[in-house]
Amino acid sequence: LNRKEKMDWRFNGIWWDQLQDDTIFRKDFKEPSKWVTNNDLSDSEYAVIWHLKGKVNSFENLSDSEKLLYLELNWANIKDFIGIEKFSNLKRLELHYCTKLASDTGLSVLKDSLEFLHINRSKKFVPTDELLSLKKIKVLCLNECGNIDNLDFLSNFPELIDFRFVNTNILDGNLQPILDHPTIRSAGFLNKRHYNYKYEKIDSILDDKFAIDNKIYAYKGEYRTFRYDYE
């Protein structure tokens, strides 16, 4: 596309230098003086946080924010999502290396807002009813999480476009629910012997099923990023 696309939380890869700096909250709780000295997110739309810790509820260390759209937690010690209700309009939640995360308890409070959920390297985490209540989810990544019995739960997400489960094992091996889903157009996983489809086959079938790309691209020199055009 020739038109200039405004960078926001919907893009697969966010170019932070194209966002207003005063909308971004960055904090490393191991080096609290590195970026901001307070924990006030009330005016932030984006938050990228490292090493968030709490004895009972890690989120107690952060202020409420109705403006927050994107929250990324790296190496947080959270075990569940209790306390995340203070970000009532959150659209995108990313968790990386949150190795203690074991439960989706508390996540359902975001069911009216959350559209992207990415959980990466939480080997104890397995989705249950709270995650399944997120009816607005469009991108779901459960990479290197706990074993999942089957993919029947995908039918709970009527607007899901992109589903990834790299290094997460689907125990029954049946990947047909990906193809049966009416809106999933992209899937990512590693091939396993007991799966009934290889990645290459799923990718080919989805390409044929959705002939139109339906992506909006942003360019920066030789690089590009995209978001799904679903609005």
What is the meaning of each model-derived region?
Residues 1-4:
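N-terminal amphipathic/basic-hydrophobic helices that include classical n-h-c signal peptides
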Residues 6-37, 43-58, 67-79, 89-102, ...:
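Concave beta-strand-loop units of leucine-rich repeat
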